């Protein structure tokens, strides 16, 4: 058994928040609905993470009380630095950023630990330039694939996880 259980919510539509299709959806409603799920997870003494593979208003997740923000850092890594106050608040309550820096698309064939490590360093530097302690960013980081690997061939999925493992050791 684990010392700490983590339950992830896969949020496939949050990236559409604010678009014309969902213009009537209010931010407070989104925060409230996510908070209800997070509170249920916390009630069972588990950590709550949310994965969003698109770009979104990341502060919504933090305001909802999530413990781990998991995002596609390969495609949208720069966007996290737009929300330094939210990330500070996440870190202040011992939350974590799960950086999906390893692509789960055909792009994986052009990537390696050697190509992704400098990219990840640059993204952390961008966030640190907003006033967040760099060592805190490192300490509160989890390295993950950008999204699920279920639609990939077994060979490419294996490559994703080998690179993820290698990158986590750098």
Predicted regions mapped to residue ranges:
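Active-site loop segments of alpha/beta catalytic cores
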Residues: 1-84, 103, 111-113
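Catalytic-face loop-and-helix region of soluble metabolic enzyme cores
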Residues: 64-170
């Amino acid at each position: 058994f684990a010392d700490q259980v983590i339950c992830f919510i896969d949020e496939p539509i949050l990236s559409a928040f604010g678009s014309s299709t969902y213009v009537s959806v209010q931010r407070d409603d989104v925060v409230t609905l996510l908070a209800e799920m997070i509170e249920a997870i916390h009630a069972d003494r588990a950590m709550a993470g949310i994965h969003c593979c698109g770009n979104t208003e990341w502060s919504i997740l933090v305001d909802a009380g999530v413990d781990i923000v998991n995002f596609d850092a390969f495609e949208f890594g720069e966007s996290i630095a737009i929300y330094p106050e939210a990330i500070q608040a996440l870190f202040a309550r011992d939350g974590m950023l799960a950086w999906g820096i390893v692509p789960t698309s055909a792009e994986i064939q052009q990537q390696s630990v050697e190509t992704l490590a400098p990219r990840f360093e640059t993204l952390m530097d961008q966030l640190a330039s907003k006033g967040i302690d760099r060592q805190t960013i490192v300490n509160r980081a989890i390295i993950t694939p950008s999204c699920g690997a279920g639609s990939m061939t077994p060979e490419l999925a294996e490559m994703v996880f080998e690179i993820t493992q290698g990158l986590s050791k750098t």
